[in-house]
């Protein structure tokens, strides 16, 4: 595709070449930010992460992001070695070092640390965790609605790699994205184990039908913070919203479709599997929810 669009698409910003990055308690220039080739995150994708957005000097829903990070770390038996408060302070310290006040995105990554030998067993990670905070100027730039293609790949299952783990290991999602791109789309629409519409490779997925907002049950997708905020906004503003099973047939005939995620908030979908969704442009419900969300985060 020559006109590829991504849910994480942002304006080019030359300032990002000179950002300061937090690495294990030290703030260093981008060119000097490094981790060991023996790091368990590099070798095996053994770690968890969070993405957090800065709007007008405030990190949106930072407490919920910290809760999710620490819950995921506990689930994989990874001791972060810091409190939630100290991790938040590291985020604020990195923000100050970069002089950022708005339209910034932070990726906070924690791995099991440096291994003594290049093999799988977690006991080989004996140095303590590795933590990195990358913070970039990231004003979203979306020239058109997203095009999706349904792919055969699925998110992890609760008994394999639970999708609620924001894991460094994203190979299934990367393969899904590759398949979608080869099908002429921007990103992938992924079904659940029962064949119902679930999520995309990078975001949670919603449709609008006859004034109702639908999203998946949440059983097989990331427990998205922006997803939950949209559900809450619908309920607070008398917009019918349902977490339910629905099929591709339901999806193709939707009036609107949109994605939710920390980076892009609410991203319109214009086409799925070659079918135009609604008018192919951002619909009135998506626009309304974007407005309500902007008020919520103070954007």
Q: Which residue ranges define each predicted feature?
A:
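Glycine- and Gly-Pro-enriched alpha-helical subdomains that act as flexible
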Residues: 189, 196-218, 223
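Secondary-structure junction motif
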Residues: 226-228
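Conserved alpha/beta cores of soluble small-molecule-handling proteins
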Residues: 1-189, 193-196, 222, 231-299
């Amino acid at each position: 595709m020559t006109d590829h669009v991504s849910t994480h698409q942002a304006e080019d910003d030359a300032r990002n070449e000179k950002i300061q990055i937090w690495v294990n308690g030290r703030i260093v220039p981008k060119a000097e930010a490094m981790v060991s080739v023996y790091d368990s995150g590099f070798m095996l994708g053994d770690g968890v992460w969070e993405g957090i957005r800065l709007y007008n000097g405030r990190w949106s829903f930072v407490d919920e992001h910290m809760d999710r990070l620490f819950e995921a770390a506990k689930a994989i038996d990874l001791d972060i070695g810091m409190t939630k408060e100290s991790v938040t302070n590291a985020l604020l310290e990195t923000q100050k070092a970069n002089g950022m006040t708005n339209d910034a995105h932070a990726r906070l990554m924690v791995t099991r640390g440096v291994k003594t030998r290049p093999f799988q067993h977690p006991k080989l990670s004996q140095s303590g965790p590795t933590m990195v905070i990358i913070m970039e100027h990231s004003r979203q730039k979306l020239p058109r609605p997203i095009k999706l293609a349904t792919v055969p790949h699925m998110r992890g299952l609760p008994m394999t790699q639970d999708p609620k783990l924001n894991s460094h290991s994203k190979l299934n999602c990367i393969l899904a994205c590759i398949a979608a791109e080869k099908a002429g789309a921007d990103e992938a629409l992924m079904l659940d184990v029962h064949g119902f519409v679930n999520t995309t490779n990078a975001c949670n997925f919603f449709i609008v039908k006859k004034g109702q907002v639908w999203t998946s049950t949440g059983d097989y997708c990331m427990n998205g913070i922006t997803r939950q905020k949209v559900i809450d906004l619908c309920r607070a503003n008398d917009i019918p919203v349902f977490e339910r099973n629905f099929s591709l047939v339901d999806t193709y005939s939707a009036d609107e479709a949109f994605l939710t995620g920390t980076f892009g908030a609410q991203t319109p979908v214009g086409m799925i599997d070659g079918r135009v969704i609604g008018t192919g442009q951002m619909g009135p419900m998506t626009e309304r929810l974007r407005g309500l969300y902007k008020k919520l985060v103070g954007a």
